[in-house]
């Protein structure tokens, strides 16, 4: 959201598509007045391609690639993981500040630790350079399908967390990858030492020992975890 997005509760594997974490995007060099707009005019949002309700930010354009209009992107979740959505989706929505564009991608592939792609209408290096700094969004519906015991983090964030006794533990506010397995960061209403309302936090490993069920339709995750842990 990151923002990579998936993990396995049963096997405790590292996520194959984790939370989206925005990475710094190098600012494009300033060009002459009107040059950038002219170069990228062929790639734009129009009434036929409205911004989708399920748009998820998955990466950003960082440079041109070659001379034929290809762009180089960094996937917020890491190439090969966040890259999965960038590679599969053929419709991209681009945003930089208040400017939005639509791009139909004709080809996309992994290149070293990045993703390179050719948007239709990007005909040369100058056109590609004009897209530097644009954040890339794809529809959640265009994400690759996962196995039954895998989940995209973007689908877990916001779910209620309850234990097996039905005690509410809070909501998933974030997902963390510690290199071994995923961890849910759960927030809940609490009271501070001064008696004022505050937000408490629980860190629950997203592994089968603790996660007993992910009930997306019901909007909750059932865990073997006590409120006083």
Curated annotation (Swiss-Prot):
Protein name as annotated: Ribosome maturation factor RimM
Q: Which family does it belong to?
A: Belongs to the RimM family.
Localization annotation: Cytoplasm
Q: Its biological function?
A: An accessory protein needed during the final step in the assembly of 30S ribosomal subunit, possibly for assembly of the head region. Essential for efficient processing of 16S rRNA. May be needed both before and after RbfA during the maturation of 16S rRNA. It has affinity for free ribosomal 30S subunits but not for 70S ribosomes.
What's the main place this protein lives?
cytoplasm
State whether it acts alone or in a complex, and with which partners, per the record: Binds ribosomal protein uS19.
GO MF entry, a single one: ribosome binding
Keywords in alphabetical order, please.
Answer: Chaperone, Cytoplasm, Ribosome biogenesis, rRNA processing
Q: Where is this region: Disordered?
A: 1-39
Q: Which Gene3D superfamilies match?
A: PRC-barrel domain, RimM
The record's domain comment reads: The PRC barrel domain binds ribosomal protein uS19.
* Residue stretches making up the PRC barrel domain: 148-229
Gene Ontology biological-process annotations:
ribosomal small subunit biogenesis; rRNA processing
What Pfam families would the database entry show?
PRC_RimM, RimM
* Cytoplasm in keyword set: yes
Q: Name one GO cellular component term.
A: cytoplasm
């Amino acid at each position: 959201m990151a923002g990579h997005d998936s993990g396995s509760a049963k096997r405790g594997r590292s996520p194959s598509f984790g939370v989206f974490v925005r990475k710094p995007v190098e600012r494009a060099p300033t060009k002459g007045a009107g040059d950038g707009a002219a170069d990228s005019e062929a790639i734009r949002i129009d009434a036929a391609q409205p911004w989708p309700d399920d748009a998820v930010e998955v990466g950003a354009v960082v440079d041109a690639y070659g001379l034929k209009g290809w762009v180089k992107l960094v996937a917020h979740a890491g190439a090969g993981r966040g890259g999965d959505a960038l590679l599969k989706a053929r419709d991209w929505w681009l945003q930089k500040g208040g400017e939005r564009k639509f791009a139909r991608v004709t080809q996309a592939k992994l290149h070293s630790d990045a993703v390179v792609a050719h948007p239709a209408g990007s005909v040369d290096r100058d056109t590609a350079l004009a897209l530097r700094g644009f954040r890339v969004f794809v529809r959640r519906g265009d994400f690759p399908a996962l196995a039954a015991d895998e989940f995209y983090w973007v689908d877990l964030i916001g779910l209620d967390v309850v234990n097996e006794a039905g005690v509410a533990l809070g909501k998933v506010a974030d997902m963390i990858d510690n290199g071994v397995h995923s961890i849910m960061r759960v927030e809940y209403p609490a009271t501070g030492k001064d008696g004022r309302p505050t937000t408490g936090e629980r860190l629950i490993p997203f592994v089968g020992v603790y996660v007993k069920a992910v009930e997306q339709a019901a909007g909750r995750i059932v865990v073997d975890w006590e409120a006083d842990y």
